[in-house]
Amino acid sequence: GVTFMFLVSLNKHLRLIKWFEEKKIQEPNLIEYLDLVSLGTVCDVVPLIGLNRAIVKQGLKVLKTKKNLGLKTLIDICGINTQPNVYHMGYVLGPRINAGGRVGKSSHGANLLINNNAKEVFKIASELDQFNKERKYLEEEVLDKITIEANKTRSDPVIIVSGKNWHEGVIGIVASRLKDKFNKPVIIITVDNSLGKASARSII
């Protein structure tokens, strides 16, 4: 949302100084990108009030038109037959777009949204759908292991657990789930070749 509002202000400034006119460049219609802005807003789990709510409301209208080939293809692959809503953004589309960065190819999410080649987009969307299935499996596997360790320290004010070779792409999600389960801050450290990587989640 912040980036979008910056672009709106920049667009207005360039219009006022007649930059588009002088460069003979068509002024971009930023409204067309509200589907992506609203998707990011929902997936960032920010409160849907004020400007955020307005952005998501208009973004859903843009998403309904399915102008973005990547989102359209992903919607079809996911079998969304109704008008996409906030649930679809946060729990169906968002996780698949993010899955590439968690267990597959980190560039897949961005490539899905900017590619206009139907064949390539379908391939990327299909792979993201598969990555998401792998992510779910890994998440549950790691969650089971970490929950056992977390239960040993559940009386501590902050739950800190560490283990070897827990998939770093899912420890953030697991930390969030354990934070909700125990209502305490959670820090998860995965160690691979003596190098530890951590993810932390805290309560409000």
Show where each model-derived region lies.
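Hydrophobic helix-and-loop "lid/oligomerization" segment in the mid-to-C-terminal part
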Residues: 12-204
